Amino acid sequence: IQSITNISTDASNLERLNRWSSAFRLFEERPFFGWGPGTYQFVYAPYQLSMNQTIITTNHGDGGNAHSEYIGALADMGVIGSLIVILLVIVSVYKGLMTYKKAKNKESKILVLAATLAIISYFTHGVLNNFLDTDKLAVPVWSCLAIITVIDVYHSGKTNYFDPISEDQ
């Protein structure tokens, strides 16, 4: 707890604040479409203020991210991309809850509830950090969305999604 609340001497926390302020400066320069997905680590160094730099600051575009799914999206994709990310989160949680309600068996309910709670947990944590640019968390997050989708399709009652739509449907 002491480390989490220390924003005056903890290098990790100070670097997070440095990354956030750099991301906001990037956003101010390109507010609508941002700098491009995944470009933060390559463009943020010149947007750091010297007074915000820490012992773990890098100036070489050799890694790092904005330490927030939402602030990172703002810098990388601007307002448009950020709204899409927020919409993805809202729709995912809504779809998870509706699929839970619609599921007809206990196993499906447990699985979709676990996947939905995982999505909620990840994107809540995403306020302070981001890992979707790494395979370690991207795979589980997108897998949870796939689980919700598969269970939703399974309980929808439609038997074949690949049949062409006929005129009387």
Predicted regions and their residues:
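Juxtamembrane transmembrane-helix termini
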Residues: Q2, V91-N105, L132-D135, H155-F162
